[in-house]
From Swiss-Prot:
This is UPF0178 protein BSUIS_A1819. Belongs to the UPF0178 family. It holds the Pfam family DUF188. CDD domains: PIN_YqxD-like (cd18720).
Length: 161
């Protein structure tokens, strides 16, 4: 991965990411490097350009730790993991969930609190459901959010390497 401070890169929490194909397409269109980080081997299509695979140890948070450590201004982090989103934002990265939700410094506190509340309710047996199934509208929202994040970074002076 290019680690020049003024370049754009995409870091993906890939183990359960449903939008990897979309990330590859957008990255190719913008000529951006992508780093797929996972706890196990994940296949990368041959046609995917500038994609690096990082397989971390089986430790539960190893992928999150790697992504948080490599997050920086100019990085776009794709994750559904709220604590990881918070850590990446602290490092100055842009963060997008696979459903297209854009996390920011001003929204992550409430999102993290809601996540912790739901975890507590689930632990107490009060809530048994989970998030809604991933839908085509989520894929579309993600594509829009990723394009928007890249455009904002370019306007802020970051560039493709």
């Amino acid at each position: 991965m290019e680690n020049e401070p003024d370049t754009i890169c995409i870091l993906v929490d890939a183990d359960a990411c449903p939008v990897k194909a979309e990330i590859y397409r957008v990255a190719e269109r913008h000529n951006l490097p992508v780093v797929i980080v996972a706890n196990s081997f994940i296949a990368i299509p041959r046609e995917a350009q500038r994609v690096e695979r990082v397989v971390v140890s089986g430790n539960l948070d190893a992928a999150d730790d790697w992504i948080a450590e490599h997050s920086r201004p100019g990085a776009v982090v794709v994750t559904a993991d709220i604590p990881l989103a918070s850590r990446a934002l602290e490092k100055g990265a842009s963060v997008i969930a696979p459903n297209g939700r854009i996390h920011t410094q001003s929204t992550i506190g409430n999102t993290l609190a809601a996540r912790n509340l739901m975890d507590s309710l689930r632990s107490a047996g009060e809530v048994t459901g989970g998030p809604a199934p991933f839908a085509p509208k989520d894929r579309s929202a993600f594509l829009s959010a990723l394009d928007l994040a890249i455009v904002r970074l370019k306007r802020a002076g970051f560039h493709a390497s």
